From Swiss-Prot:
PANTHER family: ATP SYNTHASE GAMMA CHAIN, ATP SYNTHASE SUBUNIT GAMMA, MITOCHONDRIAL
Organism whose genome encodes this protein: Rhodospirillum centenum (strain ATCC 51521 / SW)
Family: Belongs to the ATPase gamma chain family.
InterPro entries to which the protein is assigned, alphabetical: ATP_synth_F1_ATPase_gsu, ATP_synth_F1_gsu, ATP_synth_F1_gsu_CS
Alphabetized SUPFAM superfamilies for the sequence: ATP synthase (F1-ATPase), gamma subunit
NCBIfam families, A to Z: ATPsyn_F1gamma (TIGR01146), PRK05621.1-4 (NF004146)
Membrane topology qualifier: Peripheral membrane protein
Localization per Swiss-Prot or TrEMBL: Cell inner membrane
Keyword Cell membrane in record: yes
Gene Ontology biological process terms, A to Z: proton motive force-driven plasma membrane ATP synthesis
Phylogenetic lineage: Bacteria, Pseudomonadati, Pseudomonadota, Alphaproteobacteria, Rhodospirillales
The protein's name in its UniProt record: ATP synthase gamma chain
Length: 295
């Protein structure tokens, strides 16, 4: 049985941990509000951008085929997975769910005879995937949005993806990230970004009479060639915003659970301490009484 001093020390240690987790919960809650506002504000723009490009792509003549970012390379042999995780831990299953989905996708694609390459955003995902798939990682980004997430962060990632695409390093690119729903709910999402798929976001159905007629200057293909790289950056930025909000929500929930568990442990240890102390006092009384009777 542990001594009273040992139990007191353990209670003190758990209380210190509880203070830390409680403080981290409050910090995460503060960051979550800002990250959630950014993610929700960015959704309409990203959705509208995708719908506009889908509508524009529908007008491109099939004769020329359109830009490669829309038509692809004509093959789907090599897949690039952009895996978005965090740089820090203590956020529950936030990173493990993304890595699990990445592993599942890798196994499915390799099982079909495809080649897979990885671009990791976030230290945690890179470290976990490197254990099994070190040879697949072509590039990684750390400290993305460390101070404050900005469009420049998405631009850096997009520039690397486009560089790899133009070099013929892959045929299809998919971003895997956590989409924010609430502080306790994050949905793992796999979104194909190259080639651009108009079917993923289309304008609401319109009658022939109501459908407007547009005249494009310059032609649709040139406009698409300019807008598709920008749309890629927008979609990457949207994924980063969703991931940032999901990370803070997961961290707040994890720290809240840790704080509650610490409170329960303190109660149990206090009960053990009181029982041990009571047993010690009772033992001393018995010894005193026994000694008095012996006299």
């Amino acid at each position: 049985m542990p001594s009273l001093k040992d139990i007191r020390n353990r209670i003190g240690s758990v209380k210190s941990t509880q203070k830390i987790t409680s403080a981290m919960k409050m910090v995460a809650a503060s960051k979550l509000r800002r990250a959630q506002e950014q993610a929700e504000a960015g959704r309409p723009f990203a959705d509208r951008m995708a719908r506009m490009l889908a509508s524009l792509a529908a007008n491109v003549s099939g004769a020329t085929g359109g830009p490669r970012l829309m038509t692809g390379t004509g093959s789907d042999q090599v897949h690039l997975l952009v895996v978005v995780t965090s740089d820090r831990g203590l956020c529950g299953g936030f990173n493990s769910t993304i890595v699990r989905e990445a592993r599942r996708t890798i196994k499915r694609l390799t099982g079909e005879g495809r080649t897979v390459k990885l671009l990791c955003v976030g230290r945690k995902g890179r470290d976990l995937l490197r254990r099994e798939y070190a040879g697949m990682i072509v590039h990684s980004f750390e400290d993305v949005g460390r101070r404050r997430l900005s469009f420049a962060d998405a631009d850096r990632i997009t520039a690397k993806v486009l560089e790899l695409f133009e070099a013929g390093e892959f045929d299809v690119a998919t971003v895997i990230y956590n989409k924010f729903r609430s502080a306790i709910t994050q949905v793992v999402t796999a979104q194909q970004v190259i080639p651009f798929a108009p079917a993923v976001a289309t304008e609401p159905a319109e009658t022939a009479e109501a459908k407007p007629l547009y005249e494009f200057e310059p032609n649709e293909e040139k406009i698409l060639a300019e807008l598709l790289p920008r749309n890629l950056a927008v979609q990457v930025y949207s994924a980063l915003l969703e991931s940032a909000a999901s990370e803070q929500g997961a961290r707040m929930t994890a720290m809240d659970n840790a704080t509650r568990n610490a409170g329960d442990m303190i109660k149990k240890l206090t009960l053990v301490y009181n029982r041990t102390r009571q047993a010690s006092i009772t033992k001393e009384l018995i010894e005193i009484i026994s000694g008095a009777e012996a006299v």
